[in-house]
Design a protein with these regions (language model features):
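Active-site-proximal helix-loop-helix substrate-binding element of RNase H-like nuclease domains
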Residues: 27-37, 41-183, 190, 195
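Entry/capping segment at the start of metal-dependent catalytic domains
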Residues: 1-32
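Short hydrophobic beta-strand that contains or immediately precedes a catalytic carboxylate
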Residues: 5-7, 72, 94-95, 208
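Extended, well-ordered alpha-helical scaffold/bundle regions in very large, multi-domain proteins
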Residues: 189-234
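Hydrophobic, aliphatic-enriched repeat segments that assemble into extended interaction scaffolds
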Residues: 4-6, 114, 216, 224
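An acidic- and aromatic-residue-enriched active-site/binding cleft used to recognize and process polar
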Residues: 9, 75-76, 213
Length: 234
């Protein structure tokens, strides 16, 4: 079985903290800026999609290949965003390193988990990430100084962009280093299935009997009105 570790950097005008992943990725201006990946023990590669680079054909094939296990930290994000961007990759082929860490008693954060596990400095997450994400991944306020632009592009701050690419690369390094430690304590298949079900329910909802729901709402409305009228009479 081959393994592919992935981290992406994205942008959208929708606030992911307020609206959640799905509204964020469904925004018309959503796009993937950077795609970092590592095949097994090979060096991490970073694809600069924002500046016209394309994901290598063999990596695109691996995304859909059932013989390749895909890994990411908070894999629900990578899985959903890649599918929204047109890269078909089934959820059952994904493994979430964050969920694995939570199963083993660690925190949800990549940075905090890396430190808790005791990763060496060169394997830990870069601290500059939050500022870079605010600069490139969140709309900016148009001003005369910035030419009334609403997005900061790579060419507006080339040094920052190169650091952002390094941040993207390092996230894969950190995720893979954490995974190597966690693999000593495999996540049970039942836990994996539960994670998949949770992701799918959040992405697509659950089937319900709509007629039953309509009936329940009607009964609620009628009973509320009757009880209100009774309270007024009393």
């Amino acid at each position: 079985m081959k393994h592919l570790s992935i981290d992406i950097e994205t942008r959208s005008s929708v606030d992911i903290g307020k609206a959640g992943l799905y509204k964020y990725a469904q925004s018309p201006d959503f796009c993937i800026l950077l795609f970092a990946f590592q095949e097994d023990g090979n060096p991490v590669e970073v694809v600069d999609l924002a500046q016209g680079e394309e994901i290598p054909e063999h990596a695109v094939r691996m995304l859909a290949d059932p013989d390749v296990t895909k890994h990411a930290y908070n894999a629900a994000f990578e899985w959903y965003c890649l599918n929204r961007a047109g890269y078909r990759t089934p959820l059952e082929q994904w493994r979430c390193t964050m969920a694995h860490g939570l199963y083993c008693g660690y925190t949800a954060g990549l940075d905090a988990t890396g430190k808790a596990i005791g990763l060496p400095q060169d394997k830990q997450k870069l601290a500059a990430g939050k500022a870079l994400i605010r600069y490139f991944c969140v709309p900016c306020r148009p001003t005369k100084t910035n030419g009334n632009r609403t997005w900061n592009q790579p060419w507006h701050a080339k040094e920052k962009w190169e650091l952002f690419k390094e941040y993207n690369r390092q996230d894969v390094v950190t995720e893979r280093a954490i995974l190597n430690r966690l693999e000593q304590f495999p996540m049970p298949e039942a836990e994996q299935k539960q994670w998949q079900m949770d992701v799918l329910m959040n992405a697509f909802g659950v089937r319900v009997d709509t007629e039953l729901i309509k009936g329940a709402l009607y009964i609620d409305a009628v009973s509320t009105q009757e009880l209100t009228e009774e309270a007024v009479r009393i």
